[in-house]
Amino acid sequence: MARRPDLKTGPERLAALVRTTVPPMHPAGLPFVGASLAVALAGRKSRWLRNAGVASAAANAAFFRHPPRTPPTRPGVVVAPADGLICLIEDELPPAELELPAVPLPRISIFLSLFDAHVQRAPLAGEVVAVEHRPGLFGSAELAAASADNERNSVVIRSPEGAEVIAVQIAGLLARRIVCNVKSGDKVGLGDTYGLIRYGSRLDTYLPAGSDVLVEVGQRAVAGETVLAELP
């Protein structure tokens, strides 16, 4: 005779429901959510302050959400390093600070709005062979000039087969803080979280020459899942 499932009740059931329906939050968001809740607590006698603090905490929790993702299993693919809208696909020189050969490479740019999840994920499985930060401006990340002018952080990942993919975090008008949690020598899996940009930004992905680009401008990308290209 089949047994009935052991359904949790009360607080345990509520906690389980929250875990399955609410995405986890990136640790970088904890100070912002905590500060907002502190404002709500300190101003609990003021309806305006209390509501503003709770609303700010909810907005920050949503912004710093870190939803689980399932990377593709087929070999030889590059996945989107960020959620957002594919705004540019063109051939461009890689960032000069990486001191790579001055040869144009296919570049796919993804714009992250304020409402996208802002964690970045490894577009390729392999070893991090270079990480370079370059100060710059904080212009609109939607503009083509943002790749050259804005503050950026470049990460080069080399696959076991020798293919190299460059993921460039680019700050925007509201994004004034780039977080990168990897360094040269680190190993990353396809779709592993490696960084975050706060409040609106852009991700450029440089592919090896000869890669087969599988996306188009105007398409939405899902970090760690959307296949941008197949390696040559």
Swiss-Prot record:
Cofactor: pyruvate
Site (Cleavage (non-hydrolytic)): G200, S201
Membrane-topology descriptor: Peripheral membrane protein
Pfam families: PS_Dcarbxylase (PF02666)
Maturation and modification: Is synthesized initially as an inactive proenzyme. Formation of the active enzyme involves a self-maturation process in which the active site pyruvoyl group is generated from an internal serine residue via an autocatalytic post-translational modification. Two non-identical subunits are generated from the proenzyme in this reaction, and the pyruvate is formed at the N-terminus of the alpha chain, which is derived from the carboxyl end of the proenzyme.
Cofactor note: Binds 1 pyruvoyl group covalently per subunit.
Record-listed Pyruvic acid (Ser) modification sites: S201
GO cellular component: plasma membrane
Function: Catalyzes the formation of phosphatidylethanolamine (PtdEtn) from phosphatidylserine (PtdSer).
HAMAP family: PS_decarb_PSD_A
Listed name of the protein: Phosphatidylserine decarboxylase proenzyme
Protein species of origin: Mycolicibacterium gilvum (strain PYR-GCK) (Mycobacterium gilvum (strain PYR-GCK))
Encoding gene per record: psd
